[in-house]
């Protein structure tokens, strides 16, 4: 069943500045008085945040790839039932920092589980609840990894597990994202992340504006259209 709201996801390898762009986009949409539900994966619910701790903790570095994937989809099932689907059914714009494309890129490509294994989980858990628009922030893995490692050092965080995987892992993840974009160009838009934050955000807002305008022109929920709202804010 097609939902009434709009589902937008932001994706990318670690170190692309994705979470910053996510925050700026959510703030911009809220300034327009649009009904926005901001969330993230892994996380978004109490159960999801607990799973996030398990996944990101350095001490779980030997977690088997299939176990990792199963944990992620367990958290995703809870997230969908508790947050995403109810918000979409109420006509909200759900903006998520990561969703199922992360599983295809990180576990399917990065962990070498393969796309079909991820798809099997996705059919059961996500079903028809797929993103309407996905923005992939793209950056050289070498540059992104340097950023991510610097960030973790500054924060003295124990959540460095994915950054610790090395360059080859992140190169595979990037290839996964670009392959998804190649196969689904209408839904997935690649945004260069090697530019200033403001420039990246301007492109993201333009892509979202275009999508929302097209959505309304095609008979979508008019409460989500830009209408007379100020696009420049």
Where are the model-predicted features located?
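NTP-dependent small-molecule kinase module
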Residues: 26, 142-233
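P-loop (Walker A) phosphate-binding loop of NTP-binding proteins
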Residues: 13
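A glycine- and Lys/Arg-enriched "phosphate-lid" helix/loop adjacent to the NTP-binding pocket
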Residues: 103-175
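Hydrophobic positions on the alpha1 helix immediately C-terminal to the Walker A/P-loop
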Residues: 21
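Conserved lysine of the Walker
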Residues: 18
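ATP-dependent small-molecule kinase phosphotransfer cores
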Residues: 28-126, 203
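Hydrophobic anchor at the beta1->P-loop junction of P-loop NTPases
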Residues: 10
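Extreme N-terminal, non-catalytic leader segments
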Residues: 1-6
């Amino acid at each position: 069943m097609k939902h009434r709201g709009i589902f937008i996801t932001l994706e990318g390898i670690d170190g692309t500045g994705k979470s910053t762009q996510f925050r700026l986009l959510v703030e911009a949409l809220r300034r327009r008085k649009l009904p926005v539900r901001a969330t993230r994966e892994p996380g978004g619910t109490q159960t999801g945040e607990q799973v996030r701790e398990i996944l990101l903790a350095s001490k779980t570095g030997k977690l088997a790839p299939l176990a990792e994937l199963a944990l992620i989809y367990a958290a995703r099932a809870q997230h969908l039932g508790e947050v995403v689907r109810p918000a979409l059914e109420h006509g909200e714009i759900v903006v998520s920092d990561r969703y199922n494309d992360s599983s295809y890129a990180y576990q399917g490509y990065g962990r070498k589980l393969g796309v079909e294994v991820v798809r099997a989980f996705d059919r059961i858990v996500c079903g028809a609840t797929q993103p309407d628009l996905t923005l992939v922030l793209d950056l050289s893995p070498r540059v992104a990894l340097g950023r991510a490692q610097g960030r973790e050092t500054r924060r003295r965080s124990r959540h460095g597990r994915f950054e610790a995987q090395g360059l080859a892992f992140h190169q595979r993840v990037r290839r996964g994202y670009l392959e998804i974009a190649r196969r689904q160009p209408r839904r997935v838009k690649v945004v260069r992340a090697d530019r200033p934050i403001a420039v990246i955000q301007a492109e993201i807002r333009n892509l979202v504006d275009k999508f929302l305008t097209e959505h309304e022109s095609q008979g979508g929920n008019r409460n989500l259209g830009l209408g007379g709202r100020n696009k420049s804010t």
